[in-house]
Amino acid sequence: MKSKVLNYIKLARLDKPIGIYLLLWPSLLGLLLGTISEGYIDFENILIVLVGSVLVRSCGCVINDISDRNFDKVVERTKERPLASGNISLKEAWIFFIILSIASFCLLLLTPLLTLKIALFVSLLIILYPLSKRFLKAPQLILGITFGSGSVISYSLQSESFSLSIIILYFGLVAWIVSFDSFYALEDIDDDKKIGINSTPILWGGKTIFIANALHLVFYTSLLLIAYLNEFSIFFLLTMGILLILFYFQNQLAKKELYLDAFKTNNYIGLFAVLGFTAEIFFI
């Protein structure tokens, strides 16, 4: 029984929470922007965003493994995943996905109608992403659109009218997510070529790091624009300074071909962006 539970935990990647964090940070940034618009933050909305990030990321991991189960069996990094290794059957994985989806929908019933509509649309993208790797040259774009939508969903929890700031944030987040997932995909580029899976590193080739860096700087520019539009204090430049240091550190790791470590740096980038927004809104 214990080993079965552990396999379900691994199937949902709950043992590797960085994916939860990278979905959570965009969502919290959107929620914080909604707080600026409305002048308050509802504690219930924070809980919805926290729980929702766990459920949605878990759903995404399960449907991804269902879709990629035959590929995962022949890739060294993924062949021990519960579904690929046979520790969980396809039927069990589908049942688990349905349970997670129902739990996610029940959570959405606590939200405004606008939030529910946006989230249901985004749920289609969650299902589409694993398939997009087969027919889209840059599937990371679908991931960026999907993960970035967390900011819009959480913003709609706080505000029914969309501001210019949330639009800027959304496009900045899409650029950032495409950027950091391209670093992640560099780790698997040889296996992806072998099994016929598309990715931005395969599409961009030797220009991958340059383009990923350019997209990353688009994200930073979006943060500066939001700071200007919302009259953040001069202290926000301290946040941007920390983010630039992390950007430099990420590139040093990439130069050493430590792509997975470079990818993980983005967890801290998201964290400090959220802390910077929080400080400006509540304390400065």
Language-model segment annotations:
Residues 1-284:
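Multi-pass alpha-helical membrane architecture of UbiA-family
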